[in-house]
Design a protein with these regions (language model features):
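Structured aminoacyl-transfer and RNA-binding surfaces used for tRNA recognition/handling
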Residues: 1-190
């Protein structure tokens, strides 16, 4: 009865695969995402000759670290939060979105970037949201905070991974197949 109720609640039909996963969101999303891509590949659903681009935007500014028991910067502490989310820096950091973006080709990230913080008060608030005292922020990043006194124009950047584009263009399964001096996961040479 429970199984039938679950299938009905999910509008399941004959031939559907219903999966349940339990862990932290990041782990579940990564595992199920990898499974989805692997199944699509095995079932011949991926057309590797068709290039599909996607911009990913509005990343979370912070993610919770179970090890540190605090929010940490999702990318780095210099990414500008979305203007409409600035009021939540101190009260609800988990809901703050970043002015960050990735360009994805056929499911592979080929580039990423962000708008950088260009206001001293926002940078100070960001450091505080990350648990840095004014003293520690000045010790680590005083040069940056001082530079804001001279005026910083709004600026952004984007870095492409040409090696990843080449990997996709030649149909390689690993970036190590297309770079001159590939390393394995422990950073030793092949």
């Amino acid at each position: 009865d429970q199984m039938n109720a679950l299938v009905k609640a999910m509008d399941g039909e004959a031939g559907d695969l219903l999966l349940f996963a339990a862990d932290r969101n990041k782990i579940v999303w990564n595992v199920l995402g990898a499974l989805r891509v692997e199944l699509a590949d095995q079932m011949g659903l991926l057309d590797k000759s068709d290039y599909k681009f996607l911009w990913v935007t509005e990343f979370p500014q912070f993610e919770w670290s179970d090890e540190e028991e605090r929010y940490v910067a999702m990318h780095h502490p210099f990414t500008m939060p979305m203007d409409e989310d600035l009021d939540m820096l101190e009260t609800n950091p988990g809901a703050v979105r970043a002015k960050a973006y990735d360009i994805v080709l056929n499911g592979t990230e080929i580039g990423g970037g962000s708008v950088r913080i260009h206001q001293a008060d926002v940078q100070s608030r960001m450091f505080k949201a990350l648990g840095l005292t004014d003293e520690v922020a000045n010790e680590k990043f005083g040069f940056l905070l001082d530079a804001f006194k001279y005026g910083v124009p709004p600026h952004a950047g984007l870095a492409y991974g040409l090696d990843r584009v080449v990997m996709l263009m030649v149909g390689a399964d690993s970036i190590r197949d297309v770079i001159a001096f590939p390393k394995v996961k422990d950073a030793s040479c092949l």
